Swiss-Prot record:
Gene Ontology MF term list: ATP binding; phosphoribosyl-AMP cyclohydrolase activity; phosphoribosyl-ATP diphosphatase activity
Entry's Gene Ontology BP terms: L-histidine biosynthetic process
Catalytic activity: 1-(5-phospho-beta-D-ribosyl)-ATP + H2O = 1-(5-phospho-beta-D-ribosyl)-5'-AMP + diphosphate + H(+); 1-(5-phospho-beta-D-ribosyl)-5'-AMP + H2O = 1-(5-phospho-beta-D-ribosyl)-5-[(5-phospho-beta-D-ribosylamino)methylideneamino]imidazole-4-carboxamide
Protein name: Histidine biosynthesis bifunctional protein HisIE
């Protein structure tokens, strides 16, 4: 088995049909991708092969995610909750997305939100704010809006974008020297925003940055 020798599937609490809910979560940005079901056999197959397998309640059979669509899922980590009756799979999603509709996530229908920005489309539900920001900026680069500051920077090009990064970095340094925590947070946010604009202009994905950070995890940090 590919999992910890200290773990036994018998620790898990399957329902009266022998199933347990499994939530698939993007291993890099934390976005919730889908909810499916597993039985002991599909869980064992997943742990042994690292290719995620679920139990189809409609077809009453095990199915390897993406076997026909190509949208496969590779297991990075798996956890169970405090009641031992639910799983979270940290996975690498391949293909067009986790949802059969072609969306990245199955959870694209919003009921309510306390977000201050009611117009921004959330392409990665429940993901971290930096990934959501990058998705919004990337969308802006594809579908420009009149008077958009982001589109202004992208139109002006490298020199303007890099100049802004330099200015914001200098302001961040001054905020640190002044020990002004509110300004430090504000200027750090400005740097992240302008860095992401530069990445988009250069055709570099935010996930590329996350992949580099992930590769450095635990290396003499």
């Amino acid at each position: 088995m590919a999992y910890s020798k200290n773990f036994s599937i018998e620790e898990l609490r399957f329902d009266n049909k022998g199933l347990i809910p499994a939530i698939a979560q993007d291993w890099l940005d934390g976005s919730i991708l889908m909810l499916a079901w597993m039985n002991k056999e599909s869980l064992n197959k997943t742990l042994e092969t690292r290719n995620v397998h679920y139990w189809s309640r409609s077809r009453s059979e095990i199915w390897r995610k993406g076997a026909t669509s190509g949208s496969t899922q590779f297991l990075k980590e798996i956890r169970f909750d405090c009641d031992n009756d639910a799983l979270v799979l940290s996975i690498e999603q391949n293909g067009s997305g986790a949802c059969h509709t072609g969306e990245k996530s199955c959870f694209f229908n919003e009921i309510d939100s306390i977000s201050m920005n009611k117009t921004a489309k959330k392409t990665s539900p429940f993901s971290n704010i930096c990934s959501e920001l990058f998705d919004t900026l990337h969308e802006r680069s594809i579908n420009p809006l009149e008077k958009s500051y982001t589109n202004h920077l992208l139109t002006k090009g490298s020199n303007t974008i890099l100049k802004k990064i330099g200015e914001e970095t200098a302001e961040f340094i001054m905020a640190c020297k002044d020990n002004d925590k509110d300004e430090i947070a504000n200027e750090a946010s400005d740097i992240i925003y302008h860095l992401q604009v530069a990445l988009i202009y250069k055709g570099v994905k935010w996930r590329d940055v996350l992949n580099v950070l992930e590769s450095r995890r635990g290396k003499n940090n």
